[in-house]
């Protein structure tokens, strides 16, 4: 029987955070962002193993951090996010037939969303979490508006993104061979003209990228009394 493995890309340097260490190792309420994320993934009973991609020079620190998560394997990441995910895909055991990819700096994902994306992918082969755009979206060029896009058709993409292994592996190998560049995993699947299902995401499933995001994360944890009471269900 095939199992589901998670790939957690967390090898970025976090330059937009303006700190002297990668953002995933910064703390929220005395615990690193990365550990909050791994705690959330650990609440998903269908995940057999997690592969954590970190900067090569932070592997020892990461192994120390995850000692309480025996199902987590630390792997050296690459220069870009897609390089890290590719390293993760190439590290998976043969029995892993499904792959869940989740950003290491999205610590507030609920187990309900993880399960919804996983169950949808089981039916369709590929599924992503996303939320509808609420702001007006315009396309610009050279500081001038070119057009206003139809907001009803715009989705703001998150992770988790879940795929049948052969689909996402083929998509990433095609990206290597053809020089494709993408900021999310589903974009490579789309370029193979394969369908990708959308699951309604969560507004609180924030990617902690900027100092303002970090402030919001601290506030959110304080307001919610920590993660333990909320990762089992959506808000």
UniProtKB/Swiss-Prot annotation:
Family matches, as PROSITE patterns: ISPD
Catalytic activity line of the entry: 2-C-methyl-D-erythritol 4-phosphate + CTP + H(+) = 4-CDP-2-C-methyl-D-erythritol + diphosphate
**Per its UniProt record, what SUPFAM superfamilies does this chain match?**
Nucleotide-diphospho-sugar transferases
Pathway membership: Isoprenoid biosynthesis; isopentenyl diphosphate biosynthesis via DXP pathway; isopentenyl diphosphate from 1-deoxy-D-xylulose 5-phosphate: step 2/6
The record's section on Pfam families has:
IspD (PF01128)
GO terms classed as biological process: isopentenyl diphosphate biosynthetic process, methylerythritol 4-phosphate pathway
Q: Where is this site: Positions MEP for the nucleophilic attack?
A: 151, 207
EC numbers listed for it are 2.7.7.60
Sites marked Transition state stabilizer = 16, 23
Q: What top-level branch of life does the organism fall under?
A: Bacteria
* Role played: Catalyzes the formation of 4-diphosphocytidyl-2-C-methyl-D-erythritol from CTP and 2-C-methyl-D-erythritol 4-phosphate (MEP).
What NCBIfam families is this protein classified in?
ispD
Query: What family does this chain come from, according to its entry?
Result: Belongs to the IspD/TarI cytidylyltransferase family. IspD subfamily.
Tell me the protein's name: 2-C-methyl-D-erythritol 4-phosphate cytidylyltransferase
